[in-house]
């Protein structure tokens, strides 16, 4: 990069210098009677004839040079002052931009550090919600299973309430047994409710309904069989079911084994292609016979015994 150097003092000095001296008139021959004298006089006059224009041009050039020197001195001085002011402004702007850049960098660094810290509570809440979802689903499943068991028990009680003969048995129990009339044997309630996690199965020892039939005489079975103890007779099936209904039995797990698929195991190895056997193709027609043809010159000149035998064999 080239630098521009200016010297305003020298420019002002050049502008203040005196002007050039005008050209003086040259000597003119006085002339004479001869032709040579006349020619010399004409030459002197022609030389001095253009001195006025030459002096005017020299003075104009000097004036223009002085004006340019003064203009350069003024412009360079003003340009230097303007450049100094611009440099001061650029320095101030650079400081402001540097300060703004430093502030932006600090804010970006603080944002990068504070961003994860501000997201920690939200992430903790999301983790807590994720941990609570399995517990809530388990509680909902448990509540659903209890509700289904209660509904099944209510349906069984409603179905048993309308059976014939239960009213008389209950009445006899009130008379003979005191407070035993308000209870219902478990044999009449049917099988216990099956958990929802296993397929519904019914034990073979728990009948769904009582097989008790009223006697033909019209008397209630409880009054006919009441003895000294005052307790009603209970069918054997009901007694067996009462002991079994005290606790919920788990259904028997069944395992199904699918038959194995023949040749269903994966096969590992490499497949090697056997080399192809060479095939021979019979040629159609007779085999081609090659014959040797000798020119007459070859037979006459340079013929030897092996050539004779070869020609005879062919």
Curated annotation (Swiss-Prot):
It is a multi-pass membrane protein. Residues 203-212, 219-232 have a biased composition (Low complexity). The keyword rRNA-binding does not apply. Coiled coil: none annotated. Signal peptide: none annotated. Residues 165-314 are annotated as: Disordered. Residues 165-184 have a biased composition (Gly residues). This is Uncharacterized protein Rv2083.
């Amino acid at each position: 990069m080239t630098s521009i150097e200016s010297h305003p003092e020298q420019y002002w000095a050049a502008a203040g210098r005196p002007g050039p001296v005008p050209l003086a008139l040259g000597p003119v021959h006085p002339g004479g009677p001869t032709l040579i004298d006349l020619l010399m006089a004409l030459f002197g006059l022609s030389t001095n004839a253009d001195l006025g224009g030459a002096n005017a041009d020299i003075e104009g050039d000097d004036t223009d040079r002085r004006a340019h020197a003064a203009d350069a001195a003024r412009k360079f001085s003003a340009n230097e002052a303007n450049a100094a002011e611009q440099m001061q402004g650029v320095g101030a702007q650079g400081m402001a931009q540097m300060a703004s850049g430093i502030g932006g960098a600090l804010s970006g660094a603080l944002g990068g550090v504070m961003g994860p810290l501000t997201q920690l509570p939200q992430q903790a809440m999301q983790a807590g919600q994720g941990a609570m979802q399995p517990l809530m689903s388990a509680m909902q499943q448990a509540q659903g299973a209890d509700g289904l068991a209660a509904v099944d028990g209510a349906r069984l009680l409603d179905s048993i309430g309308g059976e014939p003969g239960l009213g008389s048995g209950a009445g006899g129990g009130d008379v003979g047994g005191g407070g035993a009339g308000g209870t219902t044997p478990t044999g009449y309630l049917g099988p216990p409710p099956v958990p929802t996690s296993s397929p519904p199965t019914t034990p073979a020892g728990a009948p769904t309904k009582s097989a008790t039939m009223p006697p033909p005489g019209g008397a209630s079975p409880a009054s006919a069989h009441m003895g000294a103890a005052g307790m009603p007779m209970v069918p054997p099936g009901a007694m067996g079911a009462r002991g079994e209904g005290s606790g919920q039995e788990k259904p028997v797990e069944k395992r199904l084994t699918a038959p194995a698929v023949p040749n269903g195991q994966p096969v590992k190895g490499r497949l090697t292609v056997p080399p192809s056997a060479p095939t021979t193709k019979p040629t159609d027609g007779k085999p081609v016979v090659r014959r040797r043809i000798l020119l007459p010159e070859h037979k006459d000149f340079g013929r030897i015994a092996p050539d004779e035998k070869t020609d005879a064999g062919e």
